[in-house]
Amino acid sequence: MTLANNFVTYANLIVTALNSMAARFITIEYVRKNYKKANLYYNSVFWGNLIIVVVLLVPAVLLIVNLQNCINVPSDILWDVKLLFSFVFLGFFLSTGMPNWDCGVYVTNRLDRQYVPTMMTAMLRCVMLFLMLTILTPHVWYVGFASAMVTVIGLVVNWYNTKKLTPELHITLNDRKPMCSRKALRELVGSGLWNSISNVGNMLLSGLDLIICNMILGATSMGVLSLSKILPTYMQQMSSSICSAFAPELVINYAKDDRKKLLHDILRAMKLTSVVMTIPIAGIIVLGDYFFALWVPSQDAHLLQILSILSILGYMFTSGTQILYNVFSTVNKVKQNSIAMVISGVVSVCVTLLIANFTEYGLYAVAGVSTAVNLVRNMSFTLPATARYLGFKWYQFFPQVGTTVLSSLLLVAIGFLIKPILPGGSWLELILSATVIGVIGLVVNIYLVLNAGERRYLFGKVRQKLGR
């Protein structure tokens, strides 16, 4: 399954270049009620994706037909694997070849209409796999089949959302010719390519550490580092999810050219992000040794905790400012950010190689250098650059860094003060201790980070969700 997904990942590199900025361009024109231009982008993306599907369809079919000549597959499961690849590619071609229906919830800032069905289809996928594997004769292609069915359901949900929320967006034929603009495609691909380059920089920052560790320090050290990254990885995923939730609001306010509301919403989003993100930071720093002692009792829990802390230390400064990464795509300045990402990635790799080769701090260097380089880039480029791009003073967002640091330090201090009375000898006790720290951290953050108006906004949102 992983190998099949890897082939789709390679194909997605092409699709990403066209699609990664589509929602931004469509949203701006739609919010400004320039529906004709919004539809021009909407249609151009669709026809561009359709061309990609047609181009990739033949190689995909040839790969599946001649799979045994391309990779080593045991003959007794050859047809299983071919069916698996077929369903994986089917899901890819369906999601790519259909119109950009997921932009409907983005344009109207109704991501909840996508998140809830996504969770439900993920559960449905698990149920389908469980039933197929228990009732029927087990086959590996069931995994691909379940994924393809979930993709179809997701497409239907997205189609309904787009039709309901943005009825002005539709695929159009002018005089039986597709509504498509080469200029729009060049604009979309030009910006999207820089997003792909930014991903290269991100890979240099965090995607090569295990390889470097393996090459210089050996497989054992790589295994230790890999274990230590499990919690930081979840932190990174959590940060990305939170930041993406605020992206539509940012683009909509930018399209309306309402600088006052734009700044108000950004500062509020930064504070809410800080409220949420600093709690797991404190949890990892305080209870990380308990977690690793339970998860991998044969390993050095203290070492794993230190390596994890080195990986997340930057979030103590920037967890509240993570949403500023959305600014680059909002104002279409992705080129500048991509260059900064690649430069910082190259610097990180070079410094890591030097320290790992010529000092005794190799393992700590691999875990911590990228964090330090990331922090320097954020402080020297991301914060001042995003403020200037939005028309504010370069230091506009720096006070939030101080608030985030204060919140992190206070929660960590409280955590260590109560740690002696917190149990951690079993998973149930660890969950209980983490819950205690989480509740205390949430209460402290709500009153430390948020002002009275922001607290009313937060409580109102909670009551609104609970009342549904």
For each feature predicted by the language model, list its residue ranges.
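Alpha-helical transmembrane segments of multi-pass membrane transport and lipid-handling proteins
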Residues: 46-71, 131, 263-319, 346-354, ...
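Helix-loop junctions and terminal segments of transmembrane helices
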Residues: 16-32, 107, 170-171, 228, ...
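Interfacial/gating helices of multi-pass transporter permease domains
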Residues: 1-12, 41, 140-145, 183-191, ...
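Membrane-proximal transmembrane or re-entrant/amphipathic helices at the cytosolic face
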Residues: 171, 388-397, 412-468
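Interhelical loop/hinge segments that connect adjacent transmembrane helices in multipass membrane
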Residues: 140, 144, 158-206, 249, ...
